């Protein structure tokens, strides 16, 4: 063994002995951990320094498809933002600074920069959020807002748009103040108006004056000077320089910037919206409060005219009333005629249907009663219509004109009633004929044949009672009855032919079933089939179809019941009780038919053993042929090697 191996073995033994001590273990672990941490920190610092000093230029053609590298993960987001800010040009710095001033958020700037990721939970984040919310309700913030409002009101010129209402038209006092840019630029306090109609216009005069200046295009009234990345609020003096204004109002500028400038921008927009609303309100208020011209004078003049020319007005009114009464009479008469015709037509159609239904049911008395009721009801309706016509007429008309009008109307009504009755009768007859045909088609199989001779007699008796109007109805009904008789006779003949065909079919089926059964079963079960045949014939005569076919299975079951010819039907033959001596024997009561007999099993073949394979000796086998190769070329040294 070499010396190096011996030294290594000694060292390992000493390490094992000393490793058990606690002091040695602590020293080793602490020093090793510190060494690793120092190396890691130095490597990270070197990497960050290298990235900051020598940034990689991105290639135009290539795109990064891989995930973030270790350097990007190591560098925090706050450091990246600082690097981006340092690399921005000056004009970007200026624009960003102005944007931050005028569009300042409710949260502070350091809170936004130092906030961690949104999706990570951090107790510091919640703590800072709570502090920022508390700062809104702070008293210091309220005091700053109050001071800022006071300074804005001092810087704005008051236009004093005093308005008065005379005869519903608003007028603006002080023509010199219509164009405030030309007037003297002196600061005036807002004045309150004493008029009752201008109560809502007193609300926030400072807001109103500011909006008036912006609307009329007075850019000099509120000059926002942007210099040194700061916003300043100047007076309306156009001759003053921006530098002087900045120097004079430096204290005001600092306070304006510290307070929320976002509130100012929002309020400017609110002022514009409120100003338009005030204009609309003022116009509406002026229109509503304006005195309207009274209409009593016109009425009085009319009354005086009526009093002066009373005779003329009386004549005109009398003529107008006469015309109106004549028009009303005509309208009432036409409406009465139409309503009477429609009612009579409906009543006739209903009564016609009722009469036809009653005739089918063979009720003579009810038919005559309904005809009488129809005549009485028609008389009542005619009386009512004549009564209405008589009330429509006035005392001014003569008696002769009444009688002539009534005669003409009655003639017209008679013509209209006849036309309506004929139409209703034709419609009802067509509908009922269709329904009757459907019912007859359904009732051919179920309903028995009925005689309809009585209906013809009933229709004739009712025709005499009702008169000439009902003669047409009776003729139509008689024709319908004749058609129904013909149809029912044909239906009855068809049903009888169907029953005869069905009887023939049942007889043929029974004969076939007898021929199919064997001769043995026929001799024993002949009585039962004869009985069934007589039953089926009796049932066919009553109108019902009964088909009973007998198979071989039924014949075999009847053989067991009718064992001996001397035994009566209904009694079973008692089967013999088996004993231990007759265990192998079995009592055979009936004979099995030839169709049910089982074929005998084929004879069993003798068992044959499988043939043994014949083994041949290998010595006697012919040797396997040797492999043949292609002839080698004629080279001597190859032959020598082989």
Curated annotation (Swiss-Prot):
Primary subcellular site in the record, as a coarse category: cytoplasm
Disordered: annotated span: 167-203, 284-607
Disruption phenotype: CYLC1-knockout male mice have decreased fertility, resulting in reduced pregnancy rates in mating females and reduced litter size. Knockout spermatozoa show abnormal head morphologies and varying degrees of acrosome detachment from the nuclear envelope.
Ranges annotated as biased composition (Basic residues): 317-330, 405-416
Compositionally biased intervals (Polar residues): 191-203
Basic and acidic residues composition bias: residue spans: 298-316, 353-364, 428-440, 465-488
Biased composition (Low complexity): 388-404, 513-523
Single Gene Ontology MF annotation: protein homodimerization activity
Region (8 X approximate tandem repeats): 527-543
Localization of this protein: Cytoplasm, Cytoskeleton, Perinuclear theca, Calyx; Cytoplasm, Cytoskeleton, Perinuclear theca
Free-text tissue specificity from the UniProt record: Testis.
InterPro entries: CYLC, Cylicin_N
Sequence repeat start-end pairs: 294-313, 314-344, 345-391, 392-432, 433-464, 465-500, 501-526, 527-543
Acidic residues bias spans: 454-463
GO biological process: acrosome assembly; cell morphogenesis; maintenance of cell number; single fertilization; spermatogenesis
Keywords assigned: Cytoplasm, Cytoskeleton, Developmental protein, Differentiation, Repeat, Spermatogenesis
Keyword Zinc-finger: no
Gene Ontology CC annotations of this record: acrosomal matrix; acrosomal membrane; acrosomal vesicle; cytoskeletal calyx; perinuclear theca
Pfam families per the UniProt record, alphabetical: Cylicin_N
Entry function: Plays a role in the establishment of normal sperm morphology during spermatogenesis and is required for acrosome attachment to the nuclear envelope.
Subunit note: Interacts with proteins of spermatozoa head including ACTL7A, CCIN, FAM209 and SPACA1; the interactions may be necessary for proper acrosome attachment to the nuclear envelope.
Protein name: Cylicin-1
Lineage: Eukaryota, Metazoa, Chordata, Craniata, Vertebrata
């Amino acid at each position: 063994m070499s010396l190096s191996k011996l030294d290594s073995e000694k060292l390992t033994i000493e390490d094992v002995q000393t490793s058990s001590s606690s002091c040695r273990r602590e020293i080793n672990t602490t020093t090793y951990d510190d060494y690793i941490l120092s190396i890691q920190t130095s490597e990270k610092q070197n990497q960050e320094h290298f990235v900051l000093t020598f940034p990689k230029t991105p290639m135009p053609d290539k795109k990064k498809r891989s995930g973030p590298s270790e350097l990007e993960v190591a560098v925090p987001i706050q450091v990246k933002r600082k690097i981006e800010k340092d690399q921005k040009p000056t004009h970007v710095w200026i624009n960003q600074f102005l944007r931050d001033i005028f569009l300042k958020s409710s949260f502070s700037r350091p809170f936004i920069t130092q906030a961690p990721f949104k999706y990570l939970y951090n107790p510091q984040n919640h703590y800072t959020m709570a502090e920022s919310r508390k700062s809104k309700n702070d008293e210091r913030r309220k005091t700053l807002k109050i001071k800022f409002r006071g300074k804005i009101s001092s810087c704005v010129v008051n236009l004093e748009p005093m308005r008065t209402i005379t005869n519903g038209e608003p007028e603006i006092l002080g023509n010199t103040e219509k164009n405030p840019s030309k007037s003297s630029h002196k600061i005036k306090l807002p004045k309150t108006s004493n008029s009752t109609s201008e109560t809502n216009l007193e609300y926030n005069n400072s807001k109103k004056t500011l909006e008036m200046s912006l609307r009329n295009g007075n850019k000099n009234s509120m000059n926002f000077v942007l210099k040194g990345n700061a916003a300043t609020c100047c007076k309306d003096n156009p001759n003053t320089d921006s530098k002087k204004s900045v120097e004079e109002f430096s204290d005001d500028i600092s306070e304006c910037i510290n307070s929320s400038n976002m509130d100012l921008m929002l309020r400017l927009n609110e002022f514009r919206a409120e100003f338009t609303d005030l204009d609309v309100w003022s116009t509406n208020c002026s229109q509503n409060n304006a005195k309207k011209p009274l209409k009593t004078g016109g009425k009085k003049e009319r009354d005086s005219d009526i009093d002066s020319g009373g005779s003329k007005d009386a004549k005109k009114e009398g003529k107008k009333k006469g015309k109106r009464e004549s028009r009303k009479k005509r309208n009432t008469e036409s409406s009465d005629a139409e309503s009477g015709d429609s009612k009579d037509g409906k009543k006739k159609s209903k009564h016609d249907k009722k009469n036809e239904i009653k005739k089918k049911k063979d009720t003579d008395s009810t038919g005559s009663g309904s005809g009488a009721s129809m005549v009485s009801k028609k008389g009542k309706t005619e009386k009512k219509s004549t009564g209405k016509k008589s009330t429509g007429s006035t005392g001014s008309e003569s008696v002769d004109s009444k009688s002539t009008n009534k005669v003409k109307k009655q003639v017209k009504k008679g013509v209209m009633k006849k036309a309506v009755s004929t139409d209703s009768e034709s419609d009802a007859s067509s509908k009922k004929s269709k329904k009757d045909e459907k019912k007859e088609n359904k009732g051919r199989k179920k309903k028995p044949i009925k005689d309809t001779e009585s209906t013809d007699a009933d229709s004739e008796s009712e025709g005499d009672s009702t008169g000439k109007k009902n003669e047409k109805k009776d003729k139509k009904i008689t024709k319908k009855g004749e058609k129904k008789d013909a149809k029912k006779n044909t239906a009855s003949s068809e049903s009888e032919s169907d029953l005869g065909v069905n009887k023939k079919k049942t007889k043929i089926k029974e004969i076939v079933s007898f021929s199919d059964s064997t001769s043995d079963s026929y001799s024993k079960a002949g009585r039962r089939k004869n009985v069934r045949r007589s039953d089926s014939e009796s049932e066919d005569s009553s109108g019902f179809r009964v088909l009973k076919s007998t198979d071989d299975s039924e014949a075999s079951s009847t053989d067991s019941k009718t064992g001996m010819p001397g035994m009566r039907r209904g009694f079973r033959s008692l089967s013999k009780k088996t004993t231990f001596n007759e265990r192998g024997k079995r009592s055979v009561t009936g004979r099995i038919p030839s169709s049910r007999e089982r074929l005998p099993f084929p004879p069993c073949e003798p068992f044959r053993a499988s043939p043994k394979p014949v083994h041949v000796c290998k010595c006697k086998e012919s040797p396997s042929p040797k492999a043949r190769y292609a002839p080698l070329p004629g080279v001597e040294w190859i032959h020598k090697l082989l």
